[in-house]
């Protein structure tokens, strides 16, 4: 069975998807981390995004792996553990631009579909239920008010990167979220959008456990007629 969880930034997708997967014994895949890993590789190797041939050559030879170490997922690019590095400022500021490129999305879509073969999994991202797994058994789309999402983003960044975010403000986070929403929803290839058959949950005033409970209720009641 494949469950997809999509939605804009700071709606709690990763945390919710991970907890859901743990509660039902499924494998959790954070596709945002995959895009960050690829972005890290592109930046490290100084790949010119305006040169399609150079980019495609890198994608053809891109080495990516996921390993579970001490119960945590670690992401490897060219055999280097980049799990912490992909959360850095440079990757964060570049990942939207990289992820909007058709060749990049096609490469990662192929990887994601390969990872899904023969397993029960929860895939979290922005186009999981619309493009990557259009026949997923269960599709979830998370939303949230902009002010709540901005506060979540601010708290997350200032907690993880206290030194780098000394000048960060809540207003700046709100501005960046609005900009990111617009960019993701209007990009030419595989834009962020809600699947017609998705179960929509507004996470603004709900705890993580409450959202997971809603998804489990939905899972128990839906008739999963679509093949995985």
From Swiss-Prot:
It catalyses: CMP + ATP = CDP + ADP; dCMP + ATP = dCDP + ADP. GO terms for biological process: nucleobase-containing small molecule interconversion; pyrimidine nucleotide metabolic process. InterPro entries: Cytidylate_kin, Cytidylate_kinase_dom, P-loop_NTPase. One of its GO terms (cellular component) is cytosol. Its EC number is 2.7.4.25. The keyword Membrane does not apply. One of its GO terms (molecular function) is dCMP kinase activity. The keyword Transcription regulation does not apply. ATP binds at residues 7-15. It holds the Pfam family Cytidylate_kin. It is an enzyme of class 2 (transferase). It is found in: Cytoplasm. Keywords: ATP-binding, Cytoplasm, Kinase, Nucleotide-binding, Transferase. Its main location: cytoplasm. PANTHER family: CYTIDYLATE KINASE (PTHR21299:SF2), CYTIDYLATE KINASE/PANTOATE-BETA-ALANINE LIGASE (PTHR21299). Belongs to the cytidylate kinase family. Type 1 subfamily. This is Cytidylate kinase. It comes from Protochlamydia amoebophila (strain UWE25). The lineage of its organism: Bacteria, Pseudomonadati, Chlamydiota, Chlamydiia, Parachlamydiales.
């Amino acid at each position: 069975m494949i469950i997809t969880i999509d939605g804009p930034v700071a709606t709690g997708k990763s945390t919710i998807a991970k907890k859901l997967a743990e509660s039902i014994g499924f494998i959790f895949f954070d596709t945002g981390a995959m895009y960050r890993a690829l972005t890290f590789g592109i930046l490290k190797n100084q790949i010119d995004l305006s040169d399609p041939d150079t980019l495609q050559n890198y994608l053809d030879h891109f080495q990516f792996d996921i390993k579970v170490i001490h119960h945590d997922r670690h992401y490897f690019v060219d055999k280097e553990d980049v799990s912490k590095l992909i959360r850095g400022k440079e990757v964060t500021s570049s990942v939207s631009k990289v992820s909007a490129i058709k060749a990049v999305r096609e490469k990662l879509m192929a990887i994601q579909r390969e990872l899904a073969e023969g397993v029960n999994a929860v895939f979290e991202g922005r186009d999981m239920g619309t493009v990557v797994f259009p026949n997923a058994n269960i599709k979830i789309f998370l939303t949230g008010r902009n002010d709540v999402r901005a506060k979540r983003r601010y708290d997350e960044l200032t907690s993880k990167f206290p030194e780098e975010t000394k000048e960060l403000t809540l207003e700046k986070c709100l501005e960046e979220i609005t900009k990111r929403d617009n960019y993701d929803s209007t990009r030419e290839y595989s834009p962020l959008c809600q699947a017609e058959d998705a179960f929509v949950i507004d996470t603004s005033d709900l705890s993580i456990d409450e959202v997971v409970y809603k998804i489990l209720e939905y899972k128990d009641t839906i008739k999963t007629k679509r093949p995985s």
